[in-house]
Swiss-Prot record:
This is Reverse gyrase. Introduction of positive supercoils requires the cooperation of both domains. The helicase-like domain probably does not directly unwind DNA, but more likely acts by driving ATP-dependent conformational changes within the whole enzyme. A beta hairpin in the 'latch' region of the N-terminal domain plays a regulatory role in the enzyme, repressing topoisomerase activity in the absence of ATP and preventing the enzyme from acting as an ATP-independent relaxing enzyme; it also helps to coordinate nucleotide hydrolysis by the ATPase domain with the supercoiling activity of the topoisomerase domain. A motif (DEAD box) lies at residues 213-216. Residues 636-1624 are annotated as: Topoisomerase I. ATP binds at Q89, A106, P107, T108, G109, M110, G111, K112, S113. Residues 93-256 form the Helicase ATP-binding domain. Zn(2+) 1 binds at C9, C12, C27, C30. Zn(2+) 2 binds at C723, C726, C739, C742. A zinc finger (RG N-terminal-type) spans 1-42. One of its GO terms (biological process) is intein-mediated protein splicing.
């Protein structure tokens, strides 16, 4: 038990422990003994029965009934369909049982229609009426057949009535009569029927359920919204009131957007909205309202009328359209006619392809291409707006390919959803827009696209005009359907006028076209367009045209190949035949703006066989889903999940990554629902902390119990309450529902948030808690886990450091348990804060008679710094003289008063100097600079950073990892045992790495198998990084981008790090052979006596390990017998193990020894794995073991070859041999079924292994005398050729790979150069480079593992592997992802030569603060304006100013140093000498291209130069300046007080309490009289409690708790005793 939560018992709503909650049980008062069960449903039933028996059953009954009713409905479903519910269907049923209306967001094959048909049957069995609305007559017929089939299977009889156009006259009349009389249980019609027959037949009908199967068709008549609401039980009057709320909310939104807010008007609107909402809720309470289920749309539900569902039913219709892509994007540079490339591609790729022709080539070329492909024997048809017959033929399988024009609203681009048929897309040119300079036949979206692209080329005045026009046009068309936009475009083309709003849009469209025509006449603009690398300017038949990429069409068209379905996202392939390089560049750039993870490869570099295999595997799955034959295993892949984050902004942002979400109101909270293929995800914001310590129980909210005679501290929590009127936050009610400060009843209780979360938790299979990635976030996650545990079967923690789509998906894959150590640290932090704060605050109240005062351990020393600085400030006033010299230099002279007319330059130093950039921001440096440069308070900066944060790697289990103690073990074992000390490589030298996190994830997807020339391989996820040398350059490359012919870094000559040695009893203990531990010593003593008291050594030296090696090679274990098929080893056994009795036969020797047999068995002889302790031994022991293995199973014929069936052991030996500098290769003889370990470096073998050989030394000597010794080779010929040598030495290299020792020798003669320096570093490096022979992609289902470590890498299978940005961080480390972001921006926007990647420190739990995309501030504003980047809240000018600060600092940190001509001069004045420094000139701009240099520019000076004084100013001021907020935060960081997450809060508290004020203008901090008195009192009376040193010590102790190095209960006890000693 760690804590008690008041009011959280899921049965009686009383107090309950965290232990009971996490075990999914009610409190001890309800149930004396807990009930434990792995099966969630069984647990619900068992607890319910126990509560009922005890007579304490209350709210638990609701949990039980819900599960029971779901089971009953599932039984009927199984009878009706033959299947059990899918996870998502179970979620939908739970909502229906609880009377909730909702929108279904679900991919193909999720059974939406089947569910709608079934649930209407279920309602009918309960005497309730249902209405199913479908778009067309065929679907009416299909639904009727489906229901009739279900009724027959379930043996259920209901009154089914349907109406469609294919009925005979008499059947129609009968159906209409039954509808008129309400003589039905289930009614099925089309949307058209509802629109035309509502008044006549349906207006007076009330339905318990309406199921709308296709909302797009349903919404074509917007009045269907009102009609459906009336049929559910709403009156026209209450619908009218809801419409008023919608209009009032629009007015309120406009008011809130104004910078000058009319608070009175806002309050008035809020009250009116609240009043109408209360009326609506009252109406729903008094009237029985039915349930509406709306199946997902493919388009957006536009218009305000749809919002009636939000106001009356609590949900908003989302879109089923997904923005997820699982596409291998490729390109091909044409070397022959495009048509021939297409033919070649079709023959390679097979059937099921779409071929898109760029719009500039048009329908004529599409027809020609279709005819040409037919002539080549392909079954292909052209599809256009006028000819759609090909679609039907394609769907039936009568043709294999479709050709169409790549235009956004084209039939082939948008109207096709055939995930089981479409495998790939070929683009016969880059999708593009082409504009003539006079903009003939403009469309609205093309005009917007062109304006967006060229605005940056316009003069400032025109740019401003263009931005306004652009913004107006985008805003006006936001909710206009496509067919209405086409009418506006036609009106412009034909010179017609329209009416009302449409005419207004037409006018703005016309102005935009005229604006473009005007600016495109400007030659300077045309010149800039021609120079731009992302736009193309072409002259065709004497006419100029601009071409820009049509990225929306590419996304839609390629997206036909990758669709969401039940189980994931189908893999697709896209091939672009590049017909214009500049437009292609533009397309790539825009795709990366939209998709952070976008990557495009050359077609010929793709492993086509593997890609097609995976594509076809997905198509098979989809077919099974569509046919209803999918296996239960695949069904289980689609889980319903609830993701909980802290803030609503973050929830909105995450939801937007996956399409247009459906929304539901749950109490005061909004839940967003999206599909991500394998999960139906509901995203909800918790609102941050929901619980805090109570004030009226225990010692300031902490119970002090006894545990084995020691104090045991248990915090008591209750929900946080906040008054909406006065802002007061509290925990305990003085009077229920009333704010204790102002008496208002307008109080929000976080209990409502808990209720909302519990309501949603009931619906889902798993909960993912994504609170912030720090100790505070971990504690919030722990609270959420505890209070939701009884309501959901599975709860996990997810952690992400940047809010991007890949980061979220990765976090979901890598979901983990709560980190209890982090929670413990936060418990200590909060309890310590409460105890100190309450005790000292009460003392302040008594002394100063003011209950608004407070104190804290951290804020007191910080207040002290400000008080002390103010004292220094007031005592340091002096005279200053400011002079401006004739050359413009400003000089300030301290302690000076009087006149000065001339000065002399006494001394000058001028030199060239490199100026390095600063590292990226940490929290403290960001707060300092935001204070210094932008004038932002710490609190404001943190809030802006939070807004920006919210807007915006693994291997298989058999992978061997090297630990820092020498052991080599499988990564699965390392993770399971939490092995912290790993071996990594830093600067190509070995370095110990501490594992900060251990990752174990479930994987069902592709992995890459990288096979190396030395026989080793690594099996990893596509994004797992390896250290690679390619074309003479070293860098991290993800597995998916590694190519055959690359060289991978492999550990080499590190030196062995193990040093263990054992006695026999110690080895028994290490191996866990406890049953023999005591008897072993006794047995040895007995043997000593038998041998005339001769002393027997039980130290296991190299002889013992040699014997172990022999047994590994040619030994076997039979019970207690050790049998060895190598008789020559007998003398060694007699020498090393004198206490055993040896037996012999014709071909073997052996001995019987129960203990030793068990030892060898556990060490790895036989079937078991080689025990990890072996590689922790001293080097000579391991070498002796290898020698024994060679003496048993080795041969020496030109090379040393060890043969064994135990490939697992040879693999480990191979890694070890590389570590001690012996190059080797692994090879499998498939025919013989054995592995070979081949060593060609006989020189090293002789040094390391040979001394321990006993049987085959002579064999080795013979081979060694005649064989060539092959050592390590480096793949550096391309660099080697660039070396320059002194006369007489010729540089000639024939092979790519050169022996390391030869490189070293030759380098001695080479002239100094960067190439020589690089090659020297490779020679000295503790890695070798092994060629990649083959890359395969395989499907893998199972566990994968990884670490987060203090270095960026660890050793896996001998290979250097990379291990798996948040604004609360003290790290300056930049990840590979961050470096890639910088590289893309710097190379594209500034110049490749400026880029210099820097890691800036070792990797930890956090990364430096950085942008997540290569987008600068100007471009970010444009992309938000264009709607390409969507954000959850409007960003202000201050947001962009802070973003710019972060962006420039980060990009500068990844650029080359600036080189300046530096000047430092001593200027002699009549008063004193003054130093002046700065730069005369910038010799190389480097990082200063993006950020200002920290020095001022000054003119060149000469020694002895006399300069006239132009201007003199005299003033008096303090020498010491007051602190700003930034200065204080820098001190906190420097002195180890506070944490990144608390810096801003501490300063804010001092300001709020009135201890400190901030001056206007310069924003300096000044202590108030109150602040000075409070500080003096605290430091006088309680110095030992609040001193800076004690505070710093406590920070370290809390870090130790977080790292599991200190027990949190011991720390609390120490704190408690300390407070008792000084205060109580």
């Amino acid at each position: 038990m760690k804590a008690i939560y008041r009011g959280m018992c899921p049965n009686c709503r009383g107090a309950i422990t965290d232990e009971r909650l996490s075990n999914k049980n009610p409190c001890e008062g309800c149930l004396s003994e807990p009930i434990l069960s792995e099966d969630y449903n069984e647990l619900i039933v068992a607890v319910r029965n126990a509560l009922k028996l005890r007579g304490t059953l209350k709210d638990w009954e609701e949990l039980y009934r819900l599960n029971k009713e779901v089971s009953e409905i599932e039984e009927l479903f199984e009878k009706s369909t033959g299947f059990k519910f899918w996870s998502a269907q179970r979620t939908w049923v739970k909502r229906i049982i609880r009377g909730k209306s909702f929108s279904i967001i679900a991919p193909t094959g999720m059974g939406k229609s089947t569910f709608g048909a079934f649930i209407s049957i279920y309602f009918a069995t309960k005497g309730k009426k249902s209405y199913i609305v479908v778009p067309t007559t065929p679907l009416v017929i299909q639904t009727v057949k489906k229901i009739e089939s279900m009724l027959e299977k379930a043996n259920v009889s209901v009154r089914l009535v349907y109406y469609h156009g294919n009925l005979r006259k008499k059947e129609k009349e009968e159906a209409l009569e039954k509808i008129r009389n309400g003589d039905f249980d289930i009614l099925i019609t089309s949307s058209q029927f509802l629109a035309t027959r509502f008044k006549e037949l349906l207006k007076d009908k009330k339905f318990d359920l309406i199921f709308v199967d296709d909302v797009d068709a349903f919404l074509k008549a917007s009045k269907n919204i009102d009609r459906s609401l009336i049929m559910l039980g709403f009156s026209e009057e209450i619908i009218g009131r809801a419409w008023e709320v919608i209009k009032l909310k629009k007015q309120l939104a406009k008011l809130l957007q104004n910078e000058k807010k009319n608070e009175e008007e806002i309050e008035k609107l809020n009250k009116e909205i609240e009043k109408i909402e209360d009326e609506i809720e009252e109406y729903k309470r008094r009237n029985k309202i039915g349930i509406l289920i709306v199946a997902s749309a493919t388009g957006s539900a536009k218009g305000d009328r749809i919002k009636l569902y939000r106001e009356l039913l609590g949900f908003e219709v989302g879109s089923g359209r997904s923005v997820l892509r699982n596409i291998v994007d490729t390109y091909l540079l044409p070397e022959k006619p495009i048509e021939e490339h297409v033919v070649e591609l079709l023959r390679k790729l097979g059937k099921g392809g779409l071929i898109f022709v760029p719009i500039d080539k048009g329908i004529e070329y599409a027809e020609e291409l279709t005819d040409y492909l037919k002539s080549q024997g392909f079954k292909v048809e052209l599809v256009s707006a006028k000819n759609k017959k090909g679609l039907e033929l394609f769907e039936k399988g009568e043709i294999d390919y479709l050709v169409g024009v790549a235009t956004y609203y084209g039939t082939l681009v948008r109207g096709l959803d055939l995930p089981h048929l479409i495998r790939f897309a070929i683009f016969t040119g880059v999708p593009k827009f082409r504009f003539s300079m006079d903009l003939e036949q403009p469309t609205i979206y093309r005009v917007l696209g062109l304006m967006s692209e060229i605005l940056e080329f316009l003069p400032e005045e025109k740019k401003s005009e263009g931005e306004k026009l652009y913004a107006r046009l985008r805003r006006l068309i936001r909710n206009i359907p496509q067919y209405e936009l086409m009418k506006i475009e036609e009106a412009l083309a034909e010179g017609l006028e329209l009416e009302g709003f449409h005419n207004h849009v037409l006018e703005v469209f016309k102005q935009s076209v005229e604006f473009l025509r005007e600016v495109l006449k400007d030659e300077e603009v045309i010149k800039k367009i021609a120079e731009n690398p992302f736009l193309s300017l072409k002259e065709i038949e004497g006419k100029l045209y601009i071409e820009i990429p049509d990225v929306r069409t590419y996304i839609q068209a390629s997206g036909r190949t990758s669709r969401l379905f039940a189980g994931g996202i189908t893999k697709g392939l896209s091939v672009i035949i590049v017909d214009d390089q500049k437009v292609f560049n533009g397309l790539i750039r825009q795709m990366r703006w939209r998709f952070v993870e976008f990557d495009i490869k050359k077609f010929e570099e793709v492993n086509l066989k593997e890609v097609l295999k995976e594509i076809d595997r997905d198509r098979e799955k989809v077919k099974l889903v569509i046919e209803g034959k999918i296996s239960e295993q695949v069904k289980d892949l689609v889980k319903s999940a609830l993701m909980i984050v802290e803030s609503p902004n973050k929830a909105r942002t995450i939801a937007s990554f996956f399409g247009q979400p459906s929304k539901r109101k749950i109490g005061d909270l909004t839940a967003y629902e999206v599909s991500i293929g394998d999960k139906m995800l509901t995203i909800l914001a918790s609102g941050g902390h929901m619980f805090d310590l109570v004030t009226n129980e225990g010692y300031h909210g902490v119970l002090i119990l006894k545990n084995n005679g020691k104090p045991y501290f248990v915090p008591v929590y209750d929900t946080i309450k906040r008054c909406r009127d006065c802002g007061h936050q509290f925990v305990d009610w003085e009077q229920k529902g009333v704010c204790p400060r102002c008496g208002s009843r307008n109080v929000h209780d976080a209990l409502e948030n808990v209720k909302a979360m519990r309501e949603l938790a009931l619906e889902v299979d798993e909960i993912l808690i994504g609170t912030d990635p720090d100790t505070e976030g971990e504690k919030i996650a722990w609270d959420i886990r505890n209070v939701l545990a009884p309501y959901a079967p599975n709860i996990k923690r997810i952690e992400f450091h940047e809010v991007t789509r890949p980061a979220i998906l990765r976090a979901i894959r890598e979901a983990r348990d709560i980190n209890e150590d982090r929670v413990n640290a936060q418990l200590v932090r909060r309890i310590e804060d409460r105890w100190i704060g309450f005790e000292l605050s009460q003392k302040l109240w008594e002394v100063f008679e003011n209950r608004n005062l407070s104190a804290g351990r951290v804020q007191t020393p910080v207040l002290g710094w400000i008080v002390q600085r103010y004292k220094e400030f007031t005592e340091s006033e002096t005279d200053f003289l400011g002079i401006i010299l004739e050359n413009g230099i400003n000089v300030t002279i301290e302690n000076a008063k009087g006149e000065v007319r001339e000065v002399e330059v006494k001394d000058v130093i001028i030199e060239e100097k490199d100026v390095n950039p600063l590292p990226p921001y940490t929290t403290d440096t960001m707060l300092q600079d935001a204070s210094r440069f932008l004038g932002f308070s710490a609190t404001k900066t943190m809030q802006l950073a939070q807004d920006l944060f919210e807007a915006g790697l693994c291997v298989t289990p058999d992978t061997l990892v090297s630990l820092s103690d020498g052991r080599i073990i499988e990564i699965r074992e390392a993770v399971e045992n939490s092995e912290e000390s790993l071996l990594g490589i830093n600067g190509l030298k070995p370095k110990e790495a501490k594992a900060l996190k251990f990752w174990e994830i479930d994987w069902d997807g592709p992995i890459k198998v990288i096979k190396l020339k030395n026989g080793h391989e690594i099996k990893a996820t596509p994004d797992h990084g390896l250290l690679v040398m390619r074309d003479g350059k070293i860098g991290w490359v993800s597995a998916k981008n590694i190519r055959e012919g690359d060289y991978v870094a492999f550990i080499y000559n590190l030196g062995h790090r193990g040093g263990k040695k054992y006695t026999l009893p110690q080895l028994l203990k290490e191996l866990g052979i406890s049953e023999y531990e005591n008897s072993s010593s006794q047995e040895l003593n007995n043997r000593e006596q038998e041998m005339d008291s001769k002393q027997i050594s039980i130290e296991l030296d190299e002889r013992f390990w040699y014997i172990f090696g022999v047994i590994l090679g040619k030994g076997t274990l039979k019970g207690d017998k050790v049998v060895i098929f190598q008789k020559d080893v007998k003398p060694v056994i007699e020498e090393a193990l004198p206490f055993v009795r040896i037996f012999e036969s014709a071909d073997h020797i052996g001995f019987s020894h129960l203990i030793l047999a068990e030892v060898f068995r556990r060490l790895g002889v036989g079937e078991g794995k080689l025990h990890s302790l072996v590689f922790g031994l001293r080097e000579e022991y391991i070498n002796a073991m290898i020698a024994g293995y060679f003496d048993a199973s080795g041969t020496f014929l030109r090379r040393a070859v060890l043969t064994s069936k135990r490939g697992d052991i040879l693999r480990m030996l191979s890694v070890y041999l590389y570590q001690i500098g012996i190059v080797n290769n692994l090879r499998r003889d498939e025919h013989a079924g054995v592995w070979e370990l081949i060593i060609s470096d006989l020189e090293k073998f002789r040094e390391k292994i040979y001394p321990y050989l006993r049987i085959k030394k002579s064999q080795f000597d013979k081979v060694y005398s005649i064989s060539k010794n092959e050592g390590d080779f480096l793949p550096v010929a391309s660099i080697f050729r660039k070396l320059k040598f002194r006369d007489g030495f010729k540089n000639r290299i024939l092979d790519e790979e050169i022996p390391r020792d030869e490189v070293a020798k030759v380098l001695e003669y080479a002239e100094d150069s960067p190439e020589k320096e690089f090659l020297n570093s490779l020679v000295e490096a503790r890695v070798t480079w092994v060629r990649v022979e083959k890359i395969e992609e395989r499907h893998y289902t199972g566990k994968l593992y990884d670490f987060t470590t203090t270095t960026e890498n660890f050793i896996s299978n001998g290979i250097v592997s990379h291990n798996c940005t948040y604004h609360r961080t003290d790290s300056i480390h930049v990840s590979n992802t961050g470096i890639e972001v910088a590289k893309e921006y710097i190379t594209q926007e500034i110049g490749e030569e400026y880029f210099t990647p820097r890691k800036w420190g070792e990797e930890g739990a956090h990364e430096a603060i950085r942008p997540t995309r290569p987008i600068d501030t100007g471009r970010l504003i444009q992309l938000i304006r264009d709607g390409i980047i969507t954000i959850p809240k409007n960003l202000t000018r201050d947001h962009f100013r802070l973003y710019d600060l972060i962006f420039r600092r980060f990009m500068a940190s990844q650029m080359k140093p600036a080189k300046i001509l530096y000047e430092k001069a001593i200027i002699s004045t009549p008063f004193k000498d003054v130093e002046v420094e700065g730069y005369i000139d910038v010799l190389y701009d480097g990082w200063s291209k993006i950020k200002s240099l920290p020095l001022r520019q000054i003119p060149k000076l000469e020694k002895g130069q006399r300069l006239r004084v132009k201007e003199v100013k005299q003033w008096r001021a303090p020498k010491v300046s007051l602190y700003t907020q930034g200065d204080v935060i820098a001190l906190m960081k420097e002195r180890g007080i506070g944490r990144p997450s608390t810096y801003a809060k501490i300063v804010q508290t001092l300001l709020q309490r009135g201890y400190v004020i901030e001056t206007k203008g310069k924003k300096k901090l000044v202590p108030t009289e109150k602040g000075i008195k409070v500080y003096q009192y605290l430091i006088t009376k309680y110095k030992d409690l609040v001193s800076e040193e004690r505070t710093r010590q406590l920070e370290k102790i809390m870090d130790m708790v977080e790292e599991a190095k200190a027990d949190y209960q011991d720390v609390l006890n120490e704190l408690y005793e300390e407070i008792k000693r000084y205060v109580r």
